[in-house]
């Protein structure tokens, strides 16, 4: 699997002091250029992007992470009232905090399926952070 992400660094980051519970996010990052966040669908992980990251890394600084509760990322044991700790809002908050920790104040996002719903929520909750967004395999809804 490492050959799929040549030139990328794999890391895990703990996001604490969060209204949605503590979470460990696993992600890979690398490349050069504008920051681009890739968000996977259900029931996948960041590895779903392995066929395109090599092409993207020459034009973008690519970040591809596992959403909370997917892949190697670990979310809180308790889902909270109405499963708020695993909501799109919680996942959007995670990704914004991850990108902040990497030093990116604004960035582009591509999301598929559950990742697309998370990207849509990011646009609603953090409109100054998301420069452009591409979402596919969803119809945005009230979430």
Name these PLM-found stretches.
Residues 50, 96, 120-124:
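Short, hydrophobic alpha-helix immediately C-terminal to the catalytic nucleophile
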Residues 26-76, 84:
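Conserved HGGG/HGGXW glycine-rich cap/lid loop of the alpha/beta-hydrolase fold
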Residues 3-7, 44, 87-94, 114:
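Soluble or luminal CAZymes and related metallo-dependent hydrolases
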Residues 1-35, 58-60, 85-86:
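Alpha/beta-hydrolase fold catalytic core
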Residues 10, 42, 68, 95, ...:
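Polar/charged side chains located within well-ordered beta-strands of beta-rich proteins
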């Amino acid at each position: 699997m490492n050959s799929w992400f040549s030139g990328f660094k794999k890391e895990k980051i703990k996001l604490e002091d969060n209204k949605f519970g503590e979470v460990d996010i696993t992600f890979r990052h690398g490349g050069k250029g504008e920051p681009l966040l890739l968000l996977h669908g259900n029931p996948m992980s960041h590895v779903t992007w392995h066929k395109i990251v090599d092409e993207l890394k020459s034009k973008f600084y690519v970040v591809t992470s596992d959403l909370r509760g997917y892949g190697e990322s670990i979310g809180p044991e308790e889902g909270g009232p109405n499963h708020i700790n695993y909501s799109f809002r919680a996942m959007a908050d995670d990704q914004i905090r991850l990108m902040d920790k990497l030093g990116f104040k604004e960035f582009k996002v591509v999301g598929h399926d559950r990742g697309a719903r998370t990207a849509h929520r990011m646009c609603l909750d953090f409109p100054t952070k998301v420069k452009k967004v591409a979402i596919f395999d969803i119809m945005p809804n009230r979430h």
